[in-house]
Amino acid sequence: VKDLNFSFTDFKDKKGNSLSDEAFKAGFIRYVMTDELNKDGRGACGHRQAVDYDSLLVADPIDTNLKSMSVPARTVQPIWVQCWIPQSATPGTYQGELLINDGSRLLQRLNLEITVSSRELPQPSEWAYHLDLWQSPYAVARYYQVPLWSQEHFDAMRPLMKMLADAGQKIITATLTHKPWNGQTEDYFDTMVTWMKRADGTWAFDYTIFDRWVEFMMSVGIDKQINCYSMVPWELSFQYYDQATNSLQFVKTAPGDAAYEEMWGAMLASFSKHLKEKGWFDICA
């Protein structure tokens, strides 16, 4: 199949009530390479010999941005279907079709049925469940091959983060330091705050990226809390721009050290002042 794509019909019940095709979304399931999970029963991560673990393809990401794709012969291509029932929907059983096409040529009609109950959920922003799924804007930039923090980057993130907001997400994941988890992920987390040591030895901080990120996440409906990482990164190594040498430098220091207390004392004083000015101090952790 050279141009696999899909669409929905309206869904109707026997009384003539309908659910618009706009209530339905779908995405192609993509595959990634992985290895055996928890083979040794220890339930831990860390270094291990790759030859001891078998590799395999697993269905993982749901690509909601891809509108069509080619599918080789004798392979399976799943499609994930999601239905967002509007609060105004009349209870009942609705029937409709998922149309599978190759370009403009119809391949298959899949009959679907959904039962709408009389119970009604509030809007996701009103849900009490404290959902905290970490976000990685860096992975999105790499996946869609767009410059980090560009308008194209934010445009690519918006539908993804809106899906997260619609799931009831409450927390914004923000990073204050370079590689807080020592870059163990495919796309390491960088700092959203620029740390600068001036030529006179004092500290200055630029929150431009942090502010843009938080404001963007709030614009999609995720605004209850900001979790900031990390005062104690795995490597206890902190990156900063050194004005005296016009270069990026690293300092290794730990809680209790004079250097640690000096730099973090300056940072927290500056950061708390900035958060209060933005009105975010009480929701930041």
List each model region and its residues:
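Generic marker of residues within folded, mature protein domains
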Residues: V71-A73, S88, S104
